[in-house]
Amino acid sequence: MKGKLIGDILVVKKEPEDLDEIIKLPYINKVVKLGKIHGQKREPDVEMIYGEGTETVHKENYCKFKFDVARIMWSKGNTGERLRMSTLPESDETIIDMFAGIGYFTIPMAVHSKPKKIYAIEINPVSYNYLCENVKLNKVEDIVEPILGDCGLQDFDHVADRIMMGYIGGTHHYLDSAMKYLKPGGIIHYHESTPEVILFERPVQRVQMAAEKVGRSIEVLNKRSIKKYSPGVHHTVLDIKVN
């Protein structure tokens, strides 16, 4: 069976030859063919092969994520990073998730680490609505405050112990805002799509430049490649302490 299972939906790149057998499986209620992804909102072309509707609830690491696979991206390749982030925060932390989406990182952190507060910012209204639903679905309303808007235009002033920047499309443009939001000694988890030849050099330089502009210094705590994003390009993440 080729494809990836998201909730009760089997997502495929082409119609399976063994479709009759697949739809007999009790955990598959729908089969969806996704085509090219395009636009700033990263929405794919969709063809319904079996079943009705493209909304599902996906379970991972004791968390529930409700979303529409036709309108929202779900990357299996980021599973390890979601698991890692779920255990890093301390219980007294205030966290800002600048690119919250449907709660990819916010929900695991809230469910497993139970920090004091997570401000989860999302600019896409569709993703924001699912974020709000997922906060309720996982019963973390007392921890997570969803915010609809531009993460670069918020009023936070050095309130965050930890900042999530889990987006790879021009994330560096928001580093100045992250510096404004982050407390001295706070940590930024900075994601970027980076060519192999400058795999960690470029993201480190970008964070360092943003810090130096406001008289701050950085300490790189961890750096890793999450996955290959495209030929010669990696999805990288850096954990950086900003003093």
Language model features by range: what are they?
Residues 1-243:
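SAM-dependent transferase fold signal centered on methyltransferase-like domains
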